[in-house]
């Protein structure tokens, strides 16, 4: 796991939780990492399709929209 756990706990608390277990933080971190990899992979495909090597914010945004469907 690469994402730090403390910020994950803050995200959950910002959503309204009073307390957050370590298991919950670790589980959300794993899920977010997997989602991040999937979104990045789709963004890479979009950039390559556009003839670019550089991933732009718009590639990420479009990739996220595709996953929301």
Curated annotation (Swiss-Prot):
Changing residue 56 to E/T: Loss of formation of nucleosome-like structures with DNA. Residues 19-21, 53-56 are annotated as: Interaction with DNA. Keywords: Chromosome, Cytoplasm, DNA-binding. Changing residue 13 to E/Q/T: Loss of formation of nucleosome-like structures with DNA. Its main location: cytoplasm. Induction: Expression is relatively low during exponential growth, and is higher during the stationary phase. One of its GO terms (cellular component) is chromosome. GO terms for biological process: DNA topological change; protein homooligomerization. The record marks 13 as: Interaction with DNA. InterPro entries: Archaeal_histone_HMF, CBFA_NFYB_domain, Histone-fold, HmfB-like. It is found in: Cytoplasm; Chromosome. GO terms for molecular function: double-stranded DNA binding; protein heterodimerization activity; protein homodimerization activity. Disulfide bonds: none annotated. Changing residue 52 to K: No effect on formation of nucleosome-like structures with DNA. The keyword DNA-binding applies. It comes from the Archaea. Homodimer and heterodimer of HmfA and HmfB. Heterodimers may be formed primarily when cells enter stationary growth. Dimers then assemble into higher oligomers, with the DNA wrapped around the protein core. Higher order oligomerization of these structures can give rise to long, superhelical fibers (in vitro). NCBIfam families: archaea_histone. Belongs to the archaeal histone HMF family. Binds and compacts DNA (95 to 150 base pairs) to form nucleosome-like structures that contain positive DNA supercoils. Increases the resistance of DNA to thermal denaturation in vitro. This is DNA-binding protein HMf-2. The lineage of its organism: Archaea, Methanobacteriati, Methanobacteriota, Methanomada group, Methanobacteria.
């Amino acid at each position: 796991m690469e994402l730090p756990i403390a910020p994950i706990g803050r995200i959950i608390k910002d959503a309204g939780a009073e307390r957050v277990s370590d298991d919950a933080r670790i589980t959300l971190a794993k899920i977010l990492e997997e989602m991040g990899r999937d979104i990045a992979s789709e963004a890479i495909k979009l950039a390559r399709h556009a003839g670019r090597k550089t991933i732009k914010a718009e590639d990420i945004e479009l990739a996220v929209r595709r996953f929301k469907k």
